[in-house]
Amino acid sequence: MFERAVTVEYASLTRTGAPVTIPTTPYLGEDGRSIDVSTGLTYPAKAERARRDPRVALLFADPVGSDLRDPPVVVVQGLATVRDADLQANTDRYVRASQEKLPEVTKGQPRIVLRRLNWYYARIWVEITPLHMRWWPSRALDGAPGTWNAPEGTAAPLSDPAPNGQQPPAWITPPQSWRAVVEETAGRLSMHDLTVVDGNGFPLCLPVASSEPAEDGYLLHLGPGAPDIAPGPACLTMHTHPASFTGQENRTIVGTVAAAGDAIVRFRAERALADWSIAGGKAVVALRFLATGRRLAPRLKAECRRRFQAVPEVRFPRS
């Protein structure tokens, strides 16, 4: 499942200890000991949060595109190792791995065009060493979960040193109102995932069985096998994508949670985060992607300079 899943919910912690969860594509670590995700060098926030606080979580609960029938829901909590000391090697790995896992994304596109997209292919990798796992047969979370714990003393390698200078600012303006996100996604992005902070200080991401809009956010129904949720900061994520992963839609709202009954949680929304959603037909997706490139490409040289490295090239493996 870890190898074939197209998307995973990746949760990291802000400076204040609040969880932020973003859907991304998972890959098995090259040594088989970690589950890895990546983020673009030109939008490094997901990696920088993990560099500051390595406690992260992954939720495998979306089987679309995996060709797996009725896979279990798996929550992984672990320690992150951020890798950006060799940007060319990172880029080479991402080009190779993404072509193998998601061939439809670039099918039919000339290599000469793809080689110009180094603003996108230049990557920071986040290698996650699992410490704790829980799993259920389905998103319904029926019954107590299966559990696995890493051997005592398991540790993750240290992250590469943080680059000099300031992290680039956000490049997308967030929605002015979380209520607009609720209205816009109603009945369309119905798969919700909730992230809270566990008693051990790690993010904990869980699938929501069903949700009801409320005046101050949502009432979220979790399965009977869900762990108890303590009051505190929380993140609600909505996501959808076609099986070919030729587009995606993401929405994220942050706020707080409190218990509201048996397996029911009240999520009080505070604000919506900016999201990078590219949906529609192939032509629409291509145009939006090019527009994104015009905004992010100027950051590439600056981010490489911060790391005292050359701008990486997009190099495709020889057939």
List PLM regions with ranges.
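Well-ordered, non-transmembrane segments within structured domains
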Residues: 135, 140, 148-156, 177-216
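Short beta-strand segments
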Residues: 5-42, 58-62, 71-72, 189-223
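Short, basic/aromatic recognition patches
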Residues: 1-9, 163-193
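Charged, gly/pro-rich active-site loop segments
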Residues: 67-181, 221-319
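Residue-level detection of beta-strand scaffold positions
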Residues: 7-8, 56, 123, 266
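Short coil-to-beta transition motif at edge beta-strands of beta-rich domains
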Residues: 2-4, 53-56, 188-189, 228-239
